[in-house]
């Protein structure tokens, strides 16, 4: 069931994105498997363009309080896109037991890994003392899935 939840949430992201940013572009990069388990040649799930910003977005869903970085198999590929002006690289994460949708910039994940952390925890969200940037995506639960408003992503700065 969890895999079905994840795939349906991933498929819902473009609809919410287009509702949030009318006239924007969001393109799904279909998985091109390399032949090895859980590997893909594509750097992310979606490439989106809105209001002069390019977004490289990996979409993940996870049960529980934490999202282990070991589940982010695209980390190395995504990392090669860090540092470009007006390009936002990160993960849209749905912790479905908490009805929480968040955006975690890849630079935050990079810093967490450098600090020895192995995962993103729900306690980091909305925590003023958390030194890592994690952005709550305003969302409303509709039966199972969340309707998300991605407009908060316009406030991201270079490096987020």
Regions found by a protein language model. Name each.
Residues 29, 56-59, 92:
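Short, conserved beta-strand edge motifs with alternating hydrophobic and charged residues
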Residues 46-48, 52-63:
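Conserved catalytic cores of phosphodiester-cleaving nucleases, focusing on short active-site segments
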Residues 125-160:
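Charged phosphate-binding loop/patch that engages nucleotide di/tri-phosphates or the phosphate backbone
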Residues 107-125:
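Short, electropositive alpha-helical surface patch
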Residues 1-37, 160:
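Acidic-basic catalytic patches of nuclease active cores, encompassing PD-(D/E)XK
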Residues 82-111:
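Nucleic-acid nuclease catalytic cores
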Residues 42:
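Beta-rich catalytic cores
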Residues 38, 63-75:
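Active-site-adjacent loop/helix micro-motif of nuclease/hydrolase catalytic cores
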């Amino acid at each position: 069931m969890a895999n079905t939840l994840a795939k349906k949430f991933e498929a819902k992201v473009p609809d919410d994105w287009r509702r949030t940013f009318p006239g924007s572009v969001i393109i799904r990069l279909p998985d091109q498997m390399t032949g090895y388990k859980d590997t893909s040649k594509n750097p992310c799930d979606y490439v989106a363009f809105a209001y002069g910003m390019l977004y490289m977005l990996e979409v993940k869903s996870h049960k529980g309080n934490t999202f282990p970085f070991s589940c982010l198999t695209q980390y190395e590929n995504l990392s090669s896109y860090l540092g470009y002006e007006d390009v936002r690289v990160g993960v849209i994460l749905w912790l479905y037991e908490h009805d929480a949708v968040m955006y975690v910039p890849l630079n935050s994940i990079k810093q967490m890994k450098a600090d020895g952390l192995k995962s993103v925890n729900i306690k980091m969200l909305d925590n003023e003392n958390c030194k890592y940037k994690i952005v709550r995506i305003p969302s409303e639960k509709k039966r199972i899935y969340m309707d998300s408003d991605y407009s908060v992503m316009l406030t991201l700065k270079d490096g987020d």
